[in-house]
Structures are given as C-alpha cells and as structure tokens.
C-alpha cells in the first residue's frame, strides 16, 4: 500500500492522535485527473495535494484522509485521459465527508486543494462556516506566494499556471519516478488567459503546459512543501480554538 496516497491508520491511531489536540481535525486532499502535458501524470494535482497532506500530517496531530482523485477539469476536456465530475458532485462529496467525520467525533475539516479549477470548494467552506461548522480551504494564494519566495521559485503564480515550475518541483521531490524526460524543454508561457473559462485550455496551449517546468527542482519541491506545512499552523490554531477568532484589519 502506498501510504503517501492512502493512509494506513487504524481506528486506534485516529483516536490517539485526536487526544493530542483540543479538537480533532481531518485533512482531505482533493485533486483531479487531467492532462499535465507529456511529462507529468494525469494524477499530478492529486499527488501534489497528497504530498502537502503528508507534510502536514508529519507536523500536526491531524487525521489524513484518502484523496478525492477526480475533480472539475472541464477546461482540459480536449486532451485524452482527462476525467471530470460536476461541481455539484464535488460539493456533495466534501459536504458528505464532513458530515460523516462529525458523526465519528472529528468536527473540523481542512480541504487541501491541488487543482485550481475546483472553484466550488470555496463555496463549500463558505456555506459550512455559515452553518457554524469548522472547515477551511488550504492553501490560500498567500500561502503559495510565501512558499514560492522561500523555495526560490522564479515563475510568478500567473505564469506558473499548469504543469510548470511548482508542480514539476513538487513531483521531482515527492515522486521523481513519475516525471518523464523532456520537461526540461517544455516551457510555454501564456499569461493572458482571460477567456479560459469560455474557450478552455486548448485555446492557449497545444502541449497542455503553461509555465516553465524547466526551472523545477527537487530542492524547490522540498522547500515548497516545508513552507506550506509551516503556513498550516495558523489554520490548525483557528480550527482548534475554543471560539473561532475574528480576523480583520483596522477601522479607517
């Protein structure tokens, strides 16, 4: 069993780990099954989400869950191998998972998203919060930006859109055997993607790559994951607090 993807916990492991925290917190990796060019696997987003969860689970007493491996990848439909579910289905899967966790005594859930097209996850968390539930979506754009800076990632988040420096780096660190030769010459930049939702990815790239995978390295991948694990600490504190603290700036 590959425990980097499917946790090998027993029920007693979960019970003991939960006793070390004020509240039990589960982390759910959500990815996709979509093209990532000729050099990265269809499961890249799921592998990235699971790598983040593994790093988090090594640092915090959380309950790691098996991944949701198919997401909302409709913009990649022109490439063979891509599979999608509807946003309604993904919404239901996450909400049902949270409901089931609460019945077994785990009352907080962090959704760790590995695919930018899973827009509905933000709505799931908004609605759960409005119902008084404890849920978070991770990583935020700010967390990725901090990780980029710490790891020395050259490409901006705008340019590094798909199968680029960040994803290649994380896979070179976590699953180097899955990165095929040729990524070093696969760079393709298309920063102006304003009609992406209307036209799909194929309007902007023939290869499926938008970014600079040639700049990826295992060392950058290691630092990206370490930074994200550090950023997770604030989310863990919020979800395990007796009362969810208010966040905000000063009054002007």
Positions of PLM-derived features:
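Extended, histidine- and acidic-residue-enriched regions that form the cofactor-binding/catalytic faces
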Residues: 1-108, 114-252
């Amino acid at each position: 069993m590959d425990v980097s993807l499917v946790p090998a916990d027993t029920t007693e492991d979960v019970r003991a780990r939960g006793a070390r925290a004020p509240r039990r917190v589960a982390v759910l990796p959500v990815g996709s099954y979509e093209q990532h060019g000729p050099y990265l696997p269809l499961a890249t987003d799921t592998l990235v989400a699971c790598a983040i969860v593994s790093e988090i689970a090594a640092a915090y007493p959380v309950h790691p869950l098996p991944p949701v491996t198919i997401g909302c990848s409709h913009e990649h439909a022109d490439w063979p191998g891509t599979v999608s579910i509807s946003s309604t289905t993904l919404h239901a899967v996450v909400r049902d998972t949270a409901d089931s966790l609460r019945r077994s005594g785990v009352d907080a859930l962090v959704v760790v998203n590995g695919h930018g097209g899973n827009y509905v996850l933000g709505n799931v968390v908004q609605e759960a919060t409005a119902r008084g539930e404890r849920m978070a979506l991770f990583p935020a754009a700010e967390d990725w930006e901090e990780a980029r800076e710490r790891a020395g990632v050259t490409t901006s988040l705008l340019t590094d859109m798909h199968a680029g420096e960040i994803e290649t780096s994380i896979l070179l660190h976590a699953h180097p055997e899955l990165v095929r030769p040729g990524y070093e010459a696969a760079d393709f930049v298309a920063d102006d993607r304003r009609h992406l939702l209307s036209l799909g990815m194929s309007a902007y790239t023939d290869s499926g790559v938008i970014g600079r995978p040639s700049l990826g390295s295992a060392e950058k991948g290691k630092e990206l994951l370490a930074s994200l694990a550090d950023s997770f600490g604030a989310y863990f504190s919020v979800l395990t607090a007796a009362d969810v603290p208010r966040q905000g700036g000063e009054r002007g």
